[in-house]
Structure formats: C-alpha cells, structure tokens
From Swiss-Prot:
PROSITE patterns: ADENYLOSUCCIN_SYN_1, ADENYLOSUCCIN_SYN_2. It comes from Thermoplasma acidophilum (strain ATCC 25905 / DSM 1728 / JCM 9062 / NBRC 15155 / AMRC-C165). Belongs to the adenylosuccinate synthetase family. SUPFAM superfamilies: P-loop containing nucleoside triphosphate hydrolases. It is an enzyme of class 6 (ligase). This is Adenylosuccinate synthetase. Plays an important role in the de novo pathway of purine nucleotide biosynthesis. Catalyzes the first committed step in the biosynthesis of AMP from IMP. Pathway: Purine metabolism; AMP biosynthesis via de novo pathway; AMP from IMP: step 1/2. Its cofactor is Mg(2+). Its EC number is 6.3.4.4. The active site is at 21 (proton acceptor), 49 (proton donor). It holds the Pfam family Adenylsucc_synt.
C-alpha cells in the first residue's frame, strides 16, 4: 500500500526517468535518513552520484548515495563491482559513518582492468556507430557474465581461480587484446594479484544478499533501493543501441537483489527540470549553441564519472510519460529547478510530430526518431529561489508562483504528483512539497 506523501513507507525505490544524471544520488541521500538499509541493484562505476553535506562533497560510483546516513548498505547481485575502486569509497564513508554495515553480494561480477581495455577496443570497432561508452568496462563485464566466464566476488580470495578465469577471459577476447598490454602474461598476473589483494580486504563483507535483505526486512528494517542510470539507458526500453548493459527500470529491483517488487511500497521516479545526457544517441529536445553552454554552466553539467560536458535539452513530456509508465512510479522528484529558473524563457516539449502528424508514443528505432518534431509550450523563468526555502517539508505556496505553475503543468500532463523538489546542491535544499 502506498502511503500519502511517502510517510511511513517500509520500502521504497528510487529510479531515473531520463538518461541518468537526474540527481538520484541527492534524492537518495535526502530519503536515506528515514531508512535503515540502502541497496544498489544494478550497474557499476559507470554510475556517478554526488552528495553535498556539511562534511564536504562526496562522489560515489559503487556505494549507494545513502551510505553517509543509513545503518546498512547492500551491493546486490545485479551489480558489477571493481573491488580495487570500492576500497577507497569504503574508507571515505567509514570516516563519516563508522558504524555503517556493508553487505556485498557473493554473486556480483567483478570488473577488471582488462574489461576496461576491451570496452575501449570495442568502441573503436563501432566506428560511426560509437555509443559514447564511459569506458568503465561495464559492458564487457556483463558480456562475460552471460558468457559464463566471469569472475564473481566470491572468487576473489582465491588467487588460482582468479588467474584461471582471467586466462579464460583473455582467450575469449584475444582478438581485441592482442595489441594491448594485456597480451603480456606478466601484466595479466599483476592484475590477478591486485584483484586478490582487494579481495582479501573485502571477503568479510560478502554474503548472499537476497537472504540478507529478506532477513533485514523480516526484522522490520526500512529499506530503500537506489537505481543507477535511467529508463532511456535500459537495453530493452531505452534508445538502443545507445544504452547501458544492465536493466535500469524499477523491475530490476527484483532481478538485481532477489527482493520481490510486490513488497516495494513506493517507487519514486527522479527527473531533472530539463534533460541532460552523456554520450551519443537520440535527444529530441536537445539545445545547442550559447543557450546550451549557459544551461550547462549554470547546472554544472559535466559527468561525475567521465568529466565530459553533458548534452542538455528541454524537458520532454512524451519521454517522461513513457518512463513513468514503464517504472510504474507513485510520485516524481524534480531536480535542478533552481538552474532552469535562471533562464528568461523555459520550454517544455508537450507533443511529438512525425511528418506533421501528432503521435502518442515514443519511437525507439533510429530512423523514426530522426523525424521527430517537438511541439513546445513556453513558461517564464522564475529566477533565483530564496535560501530561506529549505527544510524537509515546505508548503507549495512558499515557492515562486511561476515555478508552481511549471510544477502543476507537469503534474497535469503526466498524471503523477511531484512530491519532492531539489533546488540546490546542499542537503537542506531538497524538500518534500505539502499541497
């Protein structure tokens, strides 16, 4: 049962409604103070979540964004984990939240340096069909997972098994790696040793996470699931082939953790007040030129993982409606309203036209997408939002009237309530709206 205004939910999931980079980390951090457990269920270091607190700015790629405030964090079996990259994140979090209990799936697959190299080599082969990969080795790791040749977290305290699996992986990908440093056996053995040394440090955190999560749930713990990326990067429901390699929708809570989606009380979809994207692929409402640079600079739109400038565009309601339906969200959290409001004129895509005729769906084949003509509605910018508007809950009447108009317009078009807005980097600038 969904509880009004999200109060008292025993379980909830946070998922992205666009191309990732929506601000899920900030929303998760805001919510995590009310939850005992935060669980990640997909992706790896290709995710980048930034959290700003009184203690400083923290960027997470593997640990959930709620790690600073909650009691338990879980890395589920649907993730792919770089054990070498994970250790520094744990060390940082321990300084802020020393009592945090960390549980890592024994069955999660391991990202290696060799996978990163394969990622680079595969992108070269794609040539004109490049997808703009983050080169974090995520796709190749999932490839090895489904080829049944991958290394799992449970393997990484066994040096002989690591070496054996690395050699199998090398033979599988030798055509790509022949002219790289990994053609050298000594380099592969050095990589195996590095994984093993990290594995020794992480072994104590390993568990069957599907059992651990169910146990915590049975003990009455409140659980928050944190997704990575967004609907339009999902390989089944996004703009294929410009997608990631793990499923990103809310149903992935089940496949990535073993926890039934029927037990999730609330699904919160996160969207920016505009749209941003890293990498290649379709972007129907993309803004270019000076206005794009202005919006990018106002919003600090540079990738947490890659540092690349993000592409930016107007809020796309056909995409948002589609994502809300696929994720079956109960409410929407809107981020970066402070950034968008600084523009004199704000546009929203209300409708797609193809060959001059309206359509009521989001095409996902490249030839049709190229024909999309967005139809826009325009709003006046609402300017700077007062610093006095902060705290966990506010009345909608405290917001600028032009922003309220924008929020209500989106709610009317999409048919879901906007329950949370974020209007700045600081933790206290994310608020629940009381209407």
């Amino acid at each position: 049962m969904v509880v009004p205004n999200g109060e008292g939910d025993k379980t909830a999931a946070v998922v992205g409604l666009q191309f990732g980079d929506e601000g899920k980390g900030k929303i998760t951090d805001y919510l995590s103070g009310s939850y005992d457990v935060v669980v990640r269920f997909n992706g790896g270091t290709n995710a980048g979540h930034t959290v700003v607190t009184d203690e400083g700015t923290f960027k997470f790629h593997l640990l959930p964004s709620g790690s600073l405030r909650t009691s338990y964090v879980v890395l589920g079996s649907g993730m792919v984990i770089d054990p070498v990259a994970l250790i520094p994140e744990i060390e940082i979090v321990r300084k802020i939240n020393p009592a945090l209990k960390i549980i890592i799936s024994r069955n999660a697959h391991v990202v290696t340096k060799m996978h990163r190299q394969i990622d680079v080599e595969e992108e070269k082969i794609r040539s004109s069909l490049m997808i703009g990969t983050t080169a974090q080795g995520i796709g190749p790791t999932y490839e090895d997972k489904y080829a049944r040749t991958g290394i799992r977290m449970v393997d990484i305290s066994d040096i002989d098994l690591i070496k054996e699996k690395i050699e199998t992986m090398y033979r599988m990908h030798s055509n790509l790696l022949a002219n790289t440093e990994f053609s050298n056996l000594a380099k592969r053995e050095e990589m195996a040793k590095e994984i093993y040394e990290a594995g020794i440090k992480l072994t104590g955190y390993l568990d069957y996470t599907e059992v651990a999560i169910d146990r915590l749930y049975s003990q009455g713990k409140r659980i928050l699931f944190e997704g990575a990326q967004g609907v339009f990067l999902d390989p089944d429901f996004g703009f294929y082939p410009f997608v990631t390699s793990s499923n990103t929708i809310s149903a992935s809570v089940y496949t990535g953790t073993g926890f039934s989606l029927r037990k999730v009380n609330r699904i919160i979809g996160v969207a920016k007040a505009y749209v941003s994207k890293v990498g290649e692929g379709p972007f129907p409402t993309e803004i270019t030129g000076d206005l794009a640079k202005q919006l990018r600079d106002l919003g600090g739109e540079y990738g947490t993982t890659t540092g690349r400038p993000r592409r930016v565009g107007w809020l796309d309601l056909p995409m948002l409606k589609y994502a809300v339906r696929i994720d079956d969200v109960d409410e929407i959290a809107i981020t970066k309203v402070d950034t968008l409001g600084m523009l004199d004129t704000v546009k929203v895509c209300r409708q797609y036209l193809i060959d001059g005729k309206p359509i009521d769906y989001v095409p996902r084949d490249m030839n049709t997408i190229k024909k999309i003509e967005p139809v826009y509605d325009e709003f006046e910018g609402w300017g700077a939002i007062s610093d006095s508007i902060s705290g966990r809950k506010i009345s909608i009447d405290q917001l600028p009237s032009k922003l309220v108009k924008y929020i209500k317009y989106i709610e009317d078009q999409v048919g879901k309530p906007i329950g949370i807005i974020s209007m700045g980097k600081e933790r206290n600038r994310t608020v629940r709206i009381i209407k």
